[in-house]
Swiss-Prot record:
Keywords: Cytoplasm, Stress response
Function: Inhibits RpoS proteolysis by regulating RssB activity, thereby increasing the stability of the sigma stress factor RpoS during oxidative stress. Its effect on RpoS stability is due to its interaction with RssB, which probably blocks the interaction of RssB with RpoS, and the consequent delivery of the RssB-RpoS complex to the ClpXP protein degradation pathway.
Subcellular location, record wording: Cytoplasm
Family from the record: Belongs to the GpW/Gp25 family. IraD subfamily.
The keyword Lipoprotein is annotated on this UniProt entry: no
Quaternary organization: Interacts with RssB.
Protein name: Anti-adapter protein IraD
One MF term in the entry's GO annotations: anti-sigma factor antagonist activity
InterPro entries: Anti-adapt_IraD, IraD/Gp25-like
Span of the signal peptide: none
BP GO annotations: cellular response to oxidative stress; DNA damage response
Amino acid sequence: MMRQSLQAVLPEISGNKTSSLRKSVCSDLLTLFNSPHSALPSLLVSGMPEWQLHNQSDKHLQSWYCRQLRSALLFHEPRIAALQVNLKEAYCHTLAISLEIMLYHDDEPLTFDLVWQKGSWHRTMPQ
């Protein structure tokens, strides 16, 4: 009987830990993107406004950017098991990216959307 009541409690504890893990990863990613001394290569973070002005429609460069960002994030965030990086918008003064993240010990994907505006990254809610 004791085992049954313990099993009923475990999913809730796991759910709270998963929620906490997701919030922690999102917070750490936003900090990583906005840190003046970010571990991410500067072109991937602060170099974006200059890149957008000249190459916003270059599909090869957009693909390169996504690959480089994916590689850097996987290197710097060990809690990510799988990651897909997509450009949602690439305009003159706005860049929007979407990160589809699978975390270790989490069965549901996490979508993390960011937009570059006015010199910094901001989190947006997925649509």
